[in-house]
Amino acid sequence: MSKKRVLTGVTTTGIPHLGNYVGAIRPAVRAAQNPDTESFLFLADYHGIIKCHEPEMIHQSTQAVAATWLACGLDPERTTFYRQSDIPEVMELNWILTCITAKGLMNRAHAYKAAVQANAENGQEDPDFGVEMGLYSYPILMTADILMFNAHEVPVGRDQIQHVEMARDIAGRFNHRFRELFTLPEVKIDENVELLVGLDGRKMSKSYGNTIPLWENDKKTQKSVNKIITNMKEPGEPKKPDESPLFEIYKAFSTPSETAEFTKMLADGLAWGEAKKLLAAKINAELAEPRERYNELTADPSQIEEILQAGAQKARKEARELLGKVRDAVGIRPLK
């Protein structure tokens, strides 16, 4: 039986934080160890420049994201790990798919519709004011990313289901018009994946400014944890898990029995300050080895580059083969 192919893309527009680790990185690394799965993971740097126009941020983020996944246990021998911009075949496929994609489909993309709505609310006469073609057409590039390797499943959040549905639509259109070359990808939503709460109780997100950095040292992690909001209950007063985001973060780094014990300690009057020390210790214990590996990789980025180039070589071998069939199907052939 052939293996199920799973593809994941990570945009290079920021430095990963604890929420990224719990919600995406840790579960994806574990899933990649499944012997029945063939995993593809890529750094989506071309997607990054759609919204981020700071070259240094794109560059630094590419290094940080790659180092993060490797430090957290991604095995480049088991997972095809590459940088999007190292696979020129993706961009050629992107153009071919652009030529068969209905404009109406792009008009329905959530990001574009949100931009148009914002213009209307701001009184702009031009509904497309400020809309660049990268934002408008990026679902086609995302489709090329997926179809280039005929992924069976694409793990996404609920807000990105539309992207995979569009990829299915475009793949089906190509298959019908030219030749059956593309697998119709399926959405993969893991209901068990945790969305980590931030310092203020909302979803941990850099846009909220409520994150806990992933790669700080033990002392700085403790300082970050100390910022988690709590109520004014004194030491000795019983406390409930829902009275602070601290409990949910602790739960993400603990076994069920440890979580139960922590719940009892809170009920018995554990001081918030002591609870924060226990949480920081949990985080630091789990991340001790990954932090050491991360520092090694970022101190010598050529190690990262070597791994990415090896992944690109592996990916391009397959991409060239499929693109050759796509070119032939649309009539781009050698003259004989």
UniProtKB/Swiss-Prot annotation:
Its main location: cytoplasm. GO terms for cellular component: cytosol. A motif ('HIGH' region) lies at residues 12-20. A motif ('KMSKS' region) lies at residues 203-207. Belongs to the class-I aminoacyl-tRNA synthetase family. CDD domains: TrpRS_core. ATP binds at T11, T12, T13, G19, N20, G157, R158, D159, L196, K203, M204, S205, K206, S207. Catalyzes the attachment of tryptophan to tRNA(Trp). It is found in: Cytoplasm. Homodimer. It comes from Neisseria meningitidis serogroup A / serotype 4A (strain DSM 15465 / Z2491). L-tryptophan binds at D145. Its EC number is 6.1.1.2. Pfam families: tRNA-synt_1b. GO terms for molecular function: ATP binding; tryptophan-tRNA ligase activity. It catalyses: tRNA(Trp) + L-tryptophan + ATP = L-tryptophyl-tRNA(Trp) + AMP + diphosphate + H(+). Keywords: Aminoacyl-tRNA synthetase, ATP-binding, Cytoplasm, Ligase, Nucleotide-binding, Protein biosynthesis. This is Tryptophan--tRNA ligase. It comes from the Bacteria. InterPro entries: aa-tRNA-synth_Ic (IPR002305), Rossmann-like_a/b/a_fold (IPR014729), Trp-tRNA-ligase (IPR002306), Trp-tRNA-ligase_bac-type (IPR024109), Trp-tRNA_synthetase (IPR050203).
